[in-house]
Amino acid sequence: MMREWVLLMSVLLCGLAGPTHLFQPSLVLDMAKVLLDNYCFPENLLGMQEAIQQAIKSHEILSISDPQTLASVLTAGVQSSLNDPRLVISYEPSTPEPPPQVPALTSLSEEELLAWLQRGLRHEVLEGNVGYLRVDSVPGQEVLSMMGEFLVAHVWGNLMGTSALVLDLRHCTGGQVSGIPYIISYLHPGNTILHVDTIYNRPSNTTTEIWTLPQVLGERYGADKDVVVLTSSQTRGVAEDIAHILKQMRRAIVVGERTGGGALDLRKLRIGESDFFFTVPVSRSLGPLGGGSQTWEGSGVLPCVGTPAEQALEKALAILTLRSALPGVVHCLQEVLKDYYTLVDRVPTLLQHLASMDFSTVVSEEDLVTKLNAGLQAASEDPRLLVRAIGPTETPSWPAPDAAAEDSPGVAPELPEDEAIRQALVDSVFQVSVLPGNVGYLRFDSFADASVLGVLAPYVLRQVWEPLQDTEHLIMDLRHNPGGPSSAVPLLLSYFQGPEAGPVHLFTTYDRRTNITQEHFSHMELPGPRYSTQRGVYLLTSHRTATAAEEFAFLMQSLGWATLVGEITAGNLLHTRTVPLLDTPEGSLALTVPVLTFIDNHGEAWLGGGVVPDAIVLAEEALDKAQEVLEFHQSLGALVEGTGHLLEAHYARPEVVGQTSALLRAKLAQGAYRTAVDLESLASQLTADLQEVSGDHRLLVFHSPGELVVEEAPPPPPAVPSPEELTYLIEALFKTEVLPGQLGYLRFDAMAELETVKAVGPQLVRLVWQQLVDTAALVIDLRYNPGSYSTAIPLLCSYFFEAEPRQHLYSVFDRATSKVTEVWTLPQVAGQRYGSHKDLYILMSHTSGSAAEAFAHTMQDLQRATVIGEPTAGGALSVGIYQVGSSPLYASMPTQMAMSATTGKAWDLAGVEPDITVPMSEALSIAQDIVALRAKVPTVLQTAGKLVADNYASAELGAKMATKLSGLQSRYSRVTSEVALAEILGADLQMLSGDPHLKAAHIPENAKDRIPGIVPMQIPSPEVFEELIKFSFHTNVLEDNIGYLRFDMFGDGELLTQVSRLLVEHIWKKIMHTDAMIIDMRFNIGGPTSSIPILCSYFFDEGPPVLLDKIYSRPDDSVSELWTHAQVVGERYGSKKSMVILTSSVTAGTAEEFTYIMKRLGRALVIGEVTSGGCQPPQTYHVDDTNLYLTIPTARSVGASDGSSWEGVGVTPHVVVPAEEALARAKEMLQHNQLRVKRSPGLQDHL
């Protein structure tokens, strides 16, 4: 920005420094001051002052002696720099003062105002009840306030009854900003007010928000009525803002030309004392409509519909005519769908979708067609349901509303009785010949009605059908057949039925017009013999094949009775009807609606569209291609059967061989493979079928025109490379590295054959293994290893186990021998073993295959390694590739099956599931994290043991746990995360202590605000606490003046002391004067014990304190005593009134301590269930630099003389009943037995 200003000011200054010295540099400063003080985009002027100083110092001279030329140069410079064409500098030497602004209208008399309004406003009601209002200048608030009643009565009132409104702003070049809300408000619903714009004024440096008015004189224009705003290139200023707002509100359609891009307020200001004047926009629109980023100032308002200004009104009226017809179009569309659309289940969704569609943007028939089609397609997903525009030159032919189906049979044409003429007719329709190879050829170019075929049947049989009966295959040519009535389709299909005994279901139709569903079956009685599909039928199609010919082709393909060759058919079915929706002088709209549902024998509805052939070729090439396919099909049976035989002989999973072979034979018999037109498509279909029935993705059939080395020919002996070659290969194939922490890293991307490994073993040990064997742990990276030979796996595994005893790795079932072979580690290996105790990590990815999977699964299965990465696909230890007969078709299948040494189950099909599943790119870093974690385990166990020994409530048991914990380190050898470490540590601590309250947890960094005992809870304000108290305590006075108090958690004693007066005021006063008390602890989960003395004190008399309990604290090895308080806030309940405590199995912690104290001291009767057996409030301790935390019970009750306690065993009630019955039993006992029933001395005092 600074550079731009320097250039601009240099031009300005130089322009003022001509040889006549008429213009001083101060003019530049005056010009800048005008901009700074008045330009409504002050943010664009940053850096201008500095630029002026630099320009003044530049001393460049530009000789411009003519002031008009100078004004033009200055204007160009300013407009270019600020990118604002509204900035204009003019030279006006005869103007003593700035040109006067438009005189204030408020100074005019009422008659003058009326005359001004009549010149600036025109209104009338046009044809079609369309209101027209032309505004040439927008009056301000003062004028509208003065003349509002007149305008409403004589202008607006005449337009209120119109059906739509045209607001003509084509000649409006200005007006007052204060008039904007009035015009907008009359077009906006009155139930809400809307913020439509914010105006910034630079001279006053203020912003003014413009809102619609909550109330207006007269009525508002109906929100459901259309409004069109007309614009031209002359429309400027306030009128542009009105057009922009109404467009952004989607309240009006803007028609005409892009507006002038003016300003809300343009002022012409004198530059200093000179004769130059500066025209500057001083106000601008800030939005909010349009998000503040879209502005019309400088660029203009773009119309919704662009048209020359002089044609805008005519265009607007055409748009309104169309839009007035929209309700009728939608209603007509809905009625047609209800009456005719064949997919009845989709009609409610369509109707609902149409009812909710927004047509506010529709301004043309094209928009309407696009909108309707998008909605219909979205709701129905039926490409046949289509609205289209019919031009004025087209002549639509609408069927009668009750017309029968287009494909319904009409009156059969009368046929001549003369036999010779009938024979000639048949000869003209059908072309029959026998091609070389005894292949029949039948062409017919139209479909006749079934009744016509019935009459001509004897001639057709004799002249057409009988010559084809002895052919081995049949080619039917439908390339030139546009179809016809569908009534003959079932009859023709019946001639191709197989040897089935009964009728075959061909297809089903549902006709919406008649509401009839009809199933179509093959005819059992036919004139003449059938042509069994066992001989092979081939249909030729083209883009001209249509209607009934398409149906016939579709069904022959769907039934598996024919192979289709040629082009995709026309997709022109006779299952629809066309219904008019709208007629206008410019054309019409019509809906094509499907009236017939066509369902094939698989239950799939045919939604139109052309029939796709099995072999797609040009129509003129179809006959030659059909003969090629026919020749290929001669070998189809042998190829399919041969594939089945190979599976039976070699596939490693004999339990599924029978199923796969049976499937192949069944599909072959059904003609399912006739859709295969070459070896590629047959291979693809066979692969899909084999994988589907077996669930084995490794079964593949493929076409390879070249020769392959197949079956199990033994490979040639591996060639041993020279030492130089070997060194190069090892460095290229193996990557080794010792990572921080003595972590070895080994990557290799292929599994070599065992003999090769043995041959180069010494070099491998020297160049690779010796660098890694002494590391503390090892990562083996198989993420890029696709596998290959599995024979070296036992040798590789042996390095990670001891020599003795030998380890059973896995078993292999070999299909060729039908034997199971166990694979074991080797007793001897070259070099040093890595051993069985150091950690091993294997990295995998989805591309890791076969032998790499076998190694990883074996080491994982034997718990010797941690597998990290992605699940593998499941390869095979051995794959055989077998040629199908002598063809170029090959079958690839697993010939061996790997079985787990621990479970005996096959795993190779499922692949390897990692212990830790992460993206392959993260696997190595995760392995390093686990190594670091496992290195911490001894220290973590030591720290955990010390924390337990120093803090557990039982010092003796804590010391024993610490000692035993260090001996369990082997249980943590395969830990993979802090979460798992916490689970094992917590289980061990609870096993050693028998205490379920001694816990270990993993708490992530982002959850540490919820760790009890680590981060103190925030104490709310007194106001919030008062509401919390009301919510947390439940009180009631039951029948017979029995008090009821329930709270579900104990608070901190210090906190309760601070809010004791609130508790007394809002809780205690409600129940303190009752005759007996029920305290409900059934849902209380505990809390701090410091509040127990406060609560207990209210239920004992004033006088000597009562010892409630003694609490032993292990961290400071001390015993503290709990006593009642001598002073309490409010009144005591005393010790004479009856008191019952309700308990459940949920009652825990401090609630149990309170219950235990009141029971032991004989102050309360306990009714309910045995409590949970919790502990004193535990403490939480952080373990080293991990995210592990131990929750340790650090205190226990020691107040009972007999050493008994509730901790771990719970408090047993006096009266044991289910928790849900406890309250009823307590009320019953207090009401009926308190004064009458004599209890044992231990209970008498509190009844």
From Swiss-Prot:
Region spans: 4 X approximate tandem repeats: 18-1230
Compartment(s) of residence: Secreted, Extracellular space, Extracellular matrix, Interphotoreceptor matrix
Stretches forming Sequence repeats: 18-320, 321-630, 631-931, 932-1230
Superkingdom of the organism of origin: Eukaryota
Keyword Transmembrane attributed: no
Annotated GO CC locations: cone matrix sheath; extracellular region; extracellular space; extracellular vesicle
Residues annotated as glycosylated: N205, N515
Keywords tagged on the record: Disease variant, Extracellular matrix, Glycoprotein, Repeat, Retinitis pigmentosa, Secreted, Signal, Transport, Vitamin A
SMART domains associated with the record: TSPc (SM00245)
Keyword Transport appears in the UniProt entry: yes
SUPFAM superfamilies per UniProt: ClpP/crotonase (SSF52096)
Positions of region (Disordered): 391-413
TM segment ranges: none
InterPro entries per the UniProt record, alphabetical: ClpP/crotonase-like_dom_sf (IPR029045), Tail-specific_protease (IPR005151)
GO BP term, pick one: proteolysis
Primary localization class, coarse: secreted
Signal peptide as annotated in the record: 1-17
Summary of the function given for this chain in its UniProt record: IRBP shuttles 11-cis and all trans retinoids between the retinol isomerase in the pigment epithelium and the visual pigments in the photoreceptor cells of the retina.
Known disease link: Retinitis pigmentosa 66: A retinal dystrophy belonging to the group of pigmentary retinopathies. Retinitis pigmentosa is characterized by retinal pigment deposits visible on fundus examination and primary loss of rod photoreceptor cells followed by secondary loss of cone photoreceptors. Patients typically have night vision blindness and loss of midperipheral visual field. As their condition progresses, they lose their far peripheral visual field and eventually central vision as well.
Family recorded in the similarity comment: Belongs to the peptidase S41A family.
Protein name: Retinol-binding protein 3
Taxonomic source organism: Homo sapiens
